[in-house]
Amino acid sequence: MAYYLVQAKPIDNLLTELRQRLDSGEIKVMKPFGNALQYGLDHARLQANGIAIWEEEDYCVPPLAQERAAILDTYFVDLHVEEVN
């Protein structure tokens, strides 16, 4: 099991849409990563510099490849992923 610290700049005008998709459960049911992505984004924190930060569980190489293609690259820019040991 691998955990990653994710930092990314949210696209401000799309945050409401992302919140709606999270609240509707649409993201949670995405296979195979939906539960982990939902949990990570629900618990993300917005730092004073405008960067969102959260922890994500993932098994892919490269990390978060499926999540990026389906969700993250639509709603965030400058995504940085660091493995947590």
Identify the function of each model-found stretch.
Residues 1-52, 57-69:
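Short S/T/G/P-rich N-terminal loop/turn motif that feeds into the first structured element of a domain
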Residues 77-85:
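Conserved short beta-strand edge segments in small beta-sheet-based binding/regulatory domains
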